[in-house]
Regions:
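N-terminal lobe/hinge region of extracytoplasmic solute-binding protein
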Residues: 47-119, 156, 223
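Periplasmic binding protein-like
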Residues: 48, 409, 427-460
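Periplasmic-binding protein-like
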Residues: 58, 75, 81, 325, ...
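Aromatic- and charge-enriched surface segment that lines or borders ligand/interaction sites
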Residues: 66, 112-163, 277-280, 328-330
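Gly/Pro-rich hinge or "lid" segments in bacterial periplasmic/extracellular proteins
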Residues: 84-89, 94-103, 107, 156, ...
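Surface-exposed binding/hinge segments that line
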Residues: 117-121, 125-130, 145, 163-211, ...
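Extracellular/periplasmic solute-recognition and catalytic clefts
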Residues: 165, 175, 231-242, 269-326, ...
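Structural transition elements
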Residues: 228, 357-398, 413-420
Length: 460
């Protein structure tokens, strides 16, 4: 089978900023240095523009295997495993916890699973917490305790989907309930990423088996054991989550244990326009903005000094995908030419103001042993990150394209950073005779082009 797309790998992650709006009299200290009040208060609401603030939910049904599922249902549905936040840097621990779906092994804790053990290399046993309940959901289910059959149902449901990604759980043979609170995973082969693929990944939030009798794509039917339930959804506007006061978990602060959650409501605000987003941060209509482009940070710090900040390296990376099933992009020389024609270091220095890394994708330094620095890679890889337009022209000539060629490149208008960056990349390509036409697209059309494999020769 021919591959439909291949990455150019123009750049790795830019540094992101998170802004938290406190009251005007709040001390201007970083979040990790803030001292919690001695008596945490219950109630109120949070208005958040998340990392995906420009996008509404794509699907509420796990069987659709959409990449954004856990973002939209993560406050409602829980996982077997999760991160132990007591090991966060903000609490004196070693971990930043800013990586996308990566939890270091020494920071792994049970969420719905109370404990787990390997009976042999192909048999993993998880014992579920007792006293964890699904709340009553009219039209879906009565209140009842989570049990092992729910876990079995969940994995059978997502694995039987026609949209299943077999590479994610292909190593899994079957799942069985040994008793009411014991689940056994039988593997075809051992996979070292078992904790992510079975425990805390994108596609394994636990559902009640009553979902088999309702429309899983209807947001009104979404339910889980988590600290919130979704109570309102208006596409392109807001997703509201209301506290589940029957939630099982707690938080120890000082010497006192508090039931969770503290807040009554969380609103995910969908804000497609960057100017509107920045205005909402300044005026307090947003309590948290999870991603602020660095170009906007200095002005926000000046106009709204009460904002508290944190920063991290974005895990997604910035790259251009190419169709390699048609000429001339099926030619390796052409793809290498496109790569070395772009001055990546100049983009880091000038476009991102130094707040980016040339090589930190698909693995970032915080991924530990997974990460291999560019300096340790083969010379053929290192060459792709050195700006050399003269060699790029020679490669095109060697590929039979001395005069260059034309291509179309698609970009989602939902990503201001890409909209601003792409003309710069196109200008680099023009210097070697590659004439690229930029095609901005709304997200629905952009996603449809990707999933139906009708996308242009390139997209970012």
């Amino acid at each position: 089978m021919k591959r439909k797309a291949g990455p150019v790998g123009i750049m790795a992650g830019a540094v992101c900023a998170l802004a938290v709006l406190l009251s005007a009299c709040a001390p201007r200290t970083p979040p990790e240095a803030m001292t919690p009040s001695p008596e945490p208060q219950y109630g109120g609401e949070l208005n958040i523009a998340t990392v995906y603030a420009t996008l509404s939910a794509l699907s509420w049904d796990p069987a659709d295997w959409v990449w954004k599922q856990n973002h939209d249902t993560g406050a409602v549905r829980e996982l077997l495993l999760s991160a132990d936040l007591s090991k966060a840097r903000s609490r004196g621990g070693p971990h930043a916890f800013t990586m996308d779906v990566f939890v270091p092994r020494d920071a792994l804790r049970g969420e719905l699973a109370e404990s787990w053990e390997w009976e042999d290399p192909l048999r993993l046993v998880m014992r579920l917490r007792r006293g964890v309940f699904f709340p009553e959901k009219p039209g879906v289910m009565k209140r009842r305790e989570l049990d092992a059959e729910d876990v079995v149902y969940t994995f059978n449901y997502v694995r039987s989907s026609p949209r299943v990604q077999p590479t994610v759980m292909g190593f899994l043979d079957r799942v069985e309930a040994r008793d009411s609170h014991t689940v056994v995973f039988h593997l075809r082969e051992y996979n070292n990423e078992w904790d992510y693929r079975l425990g805390y990944g994108y596609y394994n939030a636990i559902l009640p088996r009553e979902m088999a009798d309702v429309d899983a794509r209807d947001w009104r039917n979404v339910t889980g054991t988590g600290p919130f339930s979704i109570s309102r959804y208006v596409s392109a506007s807001v997703q509201t989550y209301t506290a589940n006061r029957d939630y099982w978990d707690s938080e120890e602060i000082g010497q006192t244990t508090y039931r969770l959650p503290f807040v009554d409501r969380i609103n995910y605000r969908i804000v497609k326009d960057e100017a509107t987003f920045l205005s909402a941060l300044r005026t307090g209509k947003l309590d948290i903005g999870e991603v602020v482009r660095w170009i906007n940070v200095p002005q926000l710090k000046e106009t709204t000094p009460e904002l508290q900040w944190n920063r991290w390296l974005a895990p997604q990376g910035t790259l251009i995908a190419l169709r390699v099933d048609r000429p001339p992009l099926d030619n390796r020389l052409v793809r290498r030419a496109l790569n070395i024609a772009v001055n990546k270091q100049e983009i880091v220095d000038l476009f991102y103001g130094g707040e980016a890394e040339v090589m930190a994708f698909p693995q970032l330094p915080d991924f530990g042993a997974y990460f291999q620095p560019l300096g340790e890679m083969p010379a053929s890889v290192q060459e792709l990150f050195v700006y050399d337009p003269e060699k790029a022209r020679r490669l095109l000539a060697e590929a039979g394209l001395p005069d260059g060629f034309e291509l179309n490149i698609q970009v989602c208008s939902c990503t201001p950073d890409h909209m601003d960056l792409l003309p710069l990349i196109v200008s680099y390509w023009e210097k070697i005779g590659v004439r690229a036409r930029i095609q901005p697209m709304e997200y629905a059309a952009f996603l449809s082009a990707m999933t139906t494999r009708t996308h242009a020769e390139a997209y970012i």
